[in-house]
Amino acid sequence: MIWNNDDTEHSTGGLYRWTMDALFGRQISPSRKFKEVSQDDTNYNMKSHKDKQWDGHGFQPRTRSSSASFDRSFLQRYELLQDEEEQDIMRPVRSPARPYLSAGHAAGQDAALANDESTDTFSNKRQRFKGKFSGPKYHDESLKFRAPAKNDPFISKLFQRESPEHPSNLPGKFPSPFKQALGLPAGVQVQLDPEEQIPQKMFTDEYLQLLAELDQNGQKLKQLQQGLHQKQQDHILQETSYREKYHVMRQELITELKQSKKLYDNYYRLYEKHKKMRALDTDASRLRQRISDLEAQVVDASIEKAEEVRKLNETIFQLEFREQETQSKHERERIRYQSRIAELESIVESRLSISNGVQNPPLRERIKPVNSSARI
């Protein structure tokens, strides 16, 4: 049952509590827990690493296998290039190195450009990974960026940096005019020949082509930013749509849960009624058995009574038959007695009439009341 606290794999207790926590805000919802875990995975920092907890138990979050992943085994397997700590390759374009700029001024300009996050595309990424690649295994000299030398023929040809023509009468390396100026006392100026001065840069077709490519790259970067902004807007709209769908599904799930609760309540109500009916049915079965026993007893008693009635009827019939026989016997005897009495009366009357010579009523009439009263 889903109402118990059994969280085994064959039970739905955990699913029920998971749903109720998500709907009614008890403890913490799964969506919020997933959001926290996802945010921790995205903003993971090795310095502030803390063990994740889920229901009081520690767990290891799943890492992503990509070049920007927190799992360094991917970089070790495929030997990917590390992110650049400093973008020295962009400095000649944004801030050309000039010999007359001081080192402090150039460093301040580079720091200002480095702190400008609005124009630095990779600033956030560099800041995010800054400090994570500080171990000895990340200091591979073969992967570090090396600025090209000033006497690189490709750079010299690209920016048309001409090599100065030194006088042939000076042996050895031609001395630098800046070093000589540093060695002179204050207020002393060195006059250099126009032929010995450092030639100025010339904006050639290659340089203009490089600027055009930079402009095209800027346009492409702008288009990329617009596309990224559009994707972000689409992502926001998609999240809004997902949120609306989530609320709709959440409301539907709440309705389904309420209906399920109502269904379970009705089920348990019917189950209680079923139990009562089973108890009543047990009592009814006992009563039916009692009725059957009583009916059997009634049938047996009826049979016994019928047998007794039959026997009594037979006895009555026999008695009636005997009575009829007795009555018929008495009737025959009465008739025989009456005939004998009549005969005797006639004899007596004849004798009396002869002896007295007087006509008297018949003897029958004189003795009839006496005989009648005697018979009664």
From Swiss-Prot:
Residues 103-114 have a biased composition (Low complexity). It comes from the Eukaryota. GO terms for cellular component: cytoplasm; spindle pole body. Keywords: Coiled coil, Cytoplasm, Cytoskeleton. InterPro entries: Bbp1_C (IPR029330), Bbp1_N (IPR029328). Its main location: cytoplasm. Residues 204-350 form a coiled coil. Pfam families: BBP1_C (PF15272), BBP1_N (PF15271). It is found in: Cytoplasm, Cytoskeleton, Microtubule organizing center, Spindle pole body. Residues 34-67, 103-134 are annotated as: Disordered. Homodimer. Belongs to the BBP1 family. Component of the spindle pole body (SPB) required for insertion of the nascent SPB into the nuclear envelope and for the proper execution of spindle pole body (SPB) duplication. Connects the central plaque of the SPB with the half-bridge. Required for proper localization of CDC5 at the SPB and for proper M-phase progression. This is Spindle pole component BBP1. It comes from Lachancea thermotolerans (strain ATCC 56472 / CBS 6340 / NRRL Y-8284). The lineage of its organism: Eukaryota, Fungi, Dikarya, Ascomycota, Saccharomycotina. The gene is BBP1.
